[in-house]
Amino acid sequence: GCITTKELGTVMRSLGQNPTEAELQDMINEVDADGNGTIDFPEFLNLMARKMKDTDSEEELKEAFRVFDKDQNGFISAAELRHVMTNLGEKLTDEEVDEMIREADVDGDGQINYDEFVKVMMAK
């Protein structure tokens, strides 16, 4: 259950980041509490929490929201969510997509606005 620099790189790139090998090593060293050169899940969560608190995370969240919000109306609909998840290789049923929307949809309007999106992203 440990994450290597290679695996961390894959995750970061899927989130739109492009870290160098040295940056990945630095990130691992930063949170590698037991010094074994890999990070376990608690260390990984610690790292992600730190990355999200960085000043540029606001811009990254806006960028991610724009990727989901295809028609740029300020909301992520079930169809838009399904489209992005399919592009990421996730085959979801309508029920699963609706469930994801319900979990994030604080005001109950059936879609996800930016504030709701940020809450979900920061809660992980």
Curated annotation (Swiss-Prot):
Highest taxon of source: Eukaryota
Keywords: Calcium, Metal-binding, Methylation, Repeat
TM region(s), chain numbering: none
Annotated binding of Ca(2+) 3, by residue: D69, D71, N73, E80
Residues the entry annotates as binding Ca(2+) 1: C2, E7
Location of the EF-hand domain: 1-18, 19-54, 56-91, 92-124
Intrachain disulfide bonds: none
Function: Calmodulin mediates the control of a large number of enzymes, ion channels and other proteins by Ca(2+). Among the enzymes to be stimulated by the calmodulin-Ca(2+) complex are a number of protein kinases and phosphatases.
Similarity annotation: Belongs to the calmodulin family.
Further remarks about this protein from its record: This protein may have four calcium-binding sites.
Record protein name field: Calmodulin-2/4
